[in-house]
């Protein structure tokens, strides 16, 4: 069994003296692991950094085996991201989230969106909003998507400014006003309702919304906490915003 495909490096773990087990996110083969011989060596170590794009060839005797990867660098994203603490925290947050995906199950839209966030990480005013939307996409891909198209109480499609923590559904301004202290804010950029540039508060409201549902549906049931890198990201954004 063998295949070749581009993939995003999610991380590695040491295997013996010189080898590593590489974890990739690929478009057609999903989250996939494989042994890289010499992965701790001088040539490959810089290549196998989280966020880099590699051309990977996987080979195994049987499809269910761990198998081996041979890799070549395509995009060395880690070098341009690691010098900025906020971008680095954002990258590590995405990589940690991606490890929640079932192995070897393709998620094309989520992979494509991951690449878009990576490509935009030098654009300070864009990438945090894209990361919020990527987290929403992760929830949707794993069966916990939010219903943000109409008001849960009235069916209205206008003035949707809240989200119910119980149902994950949007709530309009009028219907939510008596309960607004118990509802999450729904920033306009999340649903594309406004062309205005999101404020710092909008971005924090977006991360607060996604963080609640990530913990509720994905992290909490697994008995694990949201990534430390995500908390660090919010701290960094507050310092710069």
What does each model-identified segment do?
Residues 1-21, 25-241:
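Non-catalytic alpha-helical scaffolds and adjoining flexible linkers that form interface surfaces
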